[in-house]
Amino acid sequence: MSRFARLLLIVALFFTNAWAKTVKETLRITWKEGAPNGQARELIYTNGQFPSPTLVWDEDDDIEGQRPIQPGNKFVYRFKASPPGNHWYHSHEKMSLVDGLYGAIHIRLTGTPRRFHMNDAKSQARRPKGDRTGLWSQISQDKDDIKAMENAAYDPEYLVVSDWSQYTSEEYWKISTDSGLLVLYAYVAPSILVNGKGEVYCPGQKFLQAELAPGLVEDAFPPGTEVSDKGCFPADLDQVQGGPWNITKRPDLIPPRVREGCVASRHENATIVVDPSKNNGWVSMHFVAAATTAQITFSVDSHEFWLYEIDGNYVNPRKFASAVMSAGETFSVMIKLDQEPGKYTMRIPNSGASQVLGGFAEMVYKGCEREEKAGKAYLSYGGNPTSPDVEKNSFFPWQLDTDHMSPWPPNKPRPGNADEEHLLVLGRVGAPYNYTMNTKYLYPVDFQNDDPLLFYPSATRDTENDGLVLRTKNGSWVDLILQVSTLPGDTASSEHFMHKHGSKTWRIGFGTGVWNYTSVEEAIQERPQDFNLETPGLRDTWITAFSIGGEAYWSVFRYFVDNPGPWLFHCHIELHLMGGMGIAILDGVDAWPEHIPEEYQLR
């Protein structure tokens, strides 16, 4: 019996608004059978629904709730709803994303405008409140449009996007560990869901082969490589398995329907009803990439959009026909409803790096629910742009020269050297499903459960486990240097979606080769073209390079320590985190309180 079958976890959330009104929300986590794509399996429901309910708060609301608890126990924790923007909640208990424990959060902007001091270190890592006129005026100078976009952003549409499998997380992990092979989640995920709805499509192997991203097989895989009728690459490729590893391989223990044997199911796709008579025809949409592995691309037929927020942080808006987002990211877009009223397909496929898989939803103008679909497609089933113009007008976050989404208002890190630098070498160790953040150390899913680092920050000192911990000083500037494709057996590294809790980071550098510099400042002097300290992006989730030909890559992320606490830094691909790809960063540990408040004492 699954661990969830015996568990009923009740989480209570309270918040007090400006009128001193207290609101209570109770989240009941249960485990039962469902069929979000038309094929039954057990999954997690929250308050009887999947995905979990959207939580909408106002900025600076005081929130009270419970941390993860054992049955029969309780614990109340308190925090402020901040910063405003598009966020999401989920669990890091093993691979519970695979089982459906995730939901959207929207913290609505409130308060009055405040001065934004660019020369103040703390302000550089914060965002302003209040007036967003400067944001919307980059989209339209019309005063009515500016007011309308402000209203649309206050009350957006929510789209929680996930990849979905017929296997539970425990079943999926067991397939890899029993077989001794890396079984990509793409192999077992036949569906893309939007707001918990989707279908299983089986268009045929030849169709899927033709939908491969141009040049992918030629660049990454041996000649003659073909996808299966589920759009999956062969599991035994060296580029997938890495190695050689000193373990026994048992491919016969992989269930027959994992990679091939597509079984179609008709169900339903999500429908987003929009009203062109509201907000001067503007609608805001919040996308949450609650995927476990998939890097998705999204577009709306005949409707370009303005991307104005990434990871809960405003960016200078840019207009696109499609955009790529990785697991763990959140995007907010503004769309002008200026087309012929009708029903338009939203295309949300896997981007094609791990699987050829289509996903769909519908955007329907109010009153047109019964009309036939209309519009011009910008993306194919497999996520390929339908024309050179669409490709030119699409957002790709691969590297510095294709990622132009700088923060609004302008917000840049301190130039020159940081106060602290930490080199982290990422890759696989010992087995195709074991992943490290620091050369050889594997982060267990129950790391320091008995002696939490929040209460015992020195618990790992002088032990092997200290390789899983970084410590920083409060008020310091920190550079995290990530190196991929250098560990033995992992020179053809897959991409990683690196997410830091507790603070956002600027990606100030990205380049090829092995990091062999004494400092970031030295690297900047030798390779200025690989750095950007004037307009770098500011986010909490970043993608590393997909080393197609075995070439090494590095990235440099800079942040300011002003939020003391123990924070997880990890890959947001569930299989990678489950395999050990995480590290604890004890930010500002010198500023932690000496005495733990009584109510937070461990019992």
From Swiss-Prot:
Gene: Mlac1
Protein name: Laccase 1
Entry-linked Pfam families: Cu-oxidase, Cu-oxidase_2, Cu-oxidase_3
Positions with a binding annotation for Cu cation 1: 499
Cofactor remark from the record: Binds 4 Cu cations per monomer.
PROSITE patterns registered for this protein in UniProt: MULTICOPPER_OXIDASE1, MULTICOPPER_OXIDASE2
All residue ranges annotated as the Plastocyanin-like domain in the record: 66-108, 159-349, 460-588
Alphabetically ordered keywords of this record: Copper, Glycoprotein, Metal-binding, Oxidoreductase, Repeat, Signal
CDD domains: CuRO_2_Abr2_like, CuRO_3_Abr2_like
Location of this chain's protein in the cell: Cell surface
